[in-house]
């Protein structure tokens, strides 16, 4: 018998594939970011070096397929397609929440297939902060073993939990549990928001807790409050539908969250990353890598080749952006000047950030 968690996972996947679930009134903020064009790049575009070292693993480009799915039999071919594409292109990938496999071990294959299809890729496991108190360190280690993960992501999705009728609304003790896991787990720990962004205040707390990287998961991409609107509407839960509509665009947009989160830790820029130019802007703002999920849901349902096609297009766009900025490698791009204007400039100014320094060549942060 399929568990409630497993049923919810396939429901989420179908909704993301078939319904408009992105932010409606809030953007990720990339339109407020301008890369400085170099009319004389003095580079051979075909010889640019896009590779990075990320949490102990070599990636051929600073990009990861963000956590999408797992935990239902129908998600196994989806994860297989994503993993095979990541392996072919030399990028990383995260699995969806492994909670379903803890609730029902028969669902483990939907996650194990990722390592089977991507034996050398950077793969991270995934569990919710609301569940780590229940599972403890031993349970978390089982998640790592399940997929031979290179790292573990602990996702923060309290906005979604607050709206879900079945959500876990008790957020007490999570930071202490994160500290404990970071101190004893033999793998890097990534803290990952899921669409509402990470603030400066929380970044400092996470750095002190010993996390290895922060995935900002900013507003401007998939809205999980929006996903819950469709679930609530289908079940006739008008109270949850109202809450989802109200909080559809809640959170810190991705660009602002990248800058808020700069605390001497690797940053993954997630939330509304849709083009290679978005990737380039993220790196220039200080991210170590970028990631996206929604652009690959439809292609993954079609198969590996469709995923490779979309990924290759984004990486080609990224290569061109690097070339036009006169950047031979990722460190050059991190040092490249970038201008922040508009709403993002106003927001960050009020938050006390001097973004004018970003317009000067050289990574001074």
Swiss-Prot record:
Superkingdom of the organism of origin: Archaea
Binding-site residues, substrate: 8-9, 97-99, 160
Reaction(s) catalysed by this chain's protein: isopentenyl diphosphate = dimethylallyl diphosphate
EC top class, as a word: isomerase
GO CC list: cytoplasm
Keywords: Cytoplasm, Flavoprotein, FMN, Isomerase, Isoprene biosynthesis, Magnesium, Metal-binding, NADP
GO MF annotation, one: isopentenyl-diphosphate delta-isomerase activity
Binding site for Mg(2+): 161
Stretches that traverse the bilayer: none
A Pfam family of this chain: FMN_dh
EC code: 5.3.3.2
UniProt subcellular location: Cytoplasm
The keyword Transcription regulation appears for this protein: no
GO biological process, one term: isoprenoid biosynthetic process
Binding-site positions, FMN: 67-69, 97, 126, 192, 222, 272-274, 293-294
Similarity annotation: Belongs to the IPP isomerase type 2 family.
Known partners and oligomeric status: Homooctamer. Dimer of tetramers.
Protein name per its UniProtKB record: Isopentenyl-diphosphate delta-isomerase
Gene: fni
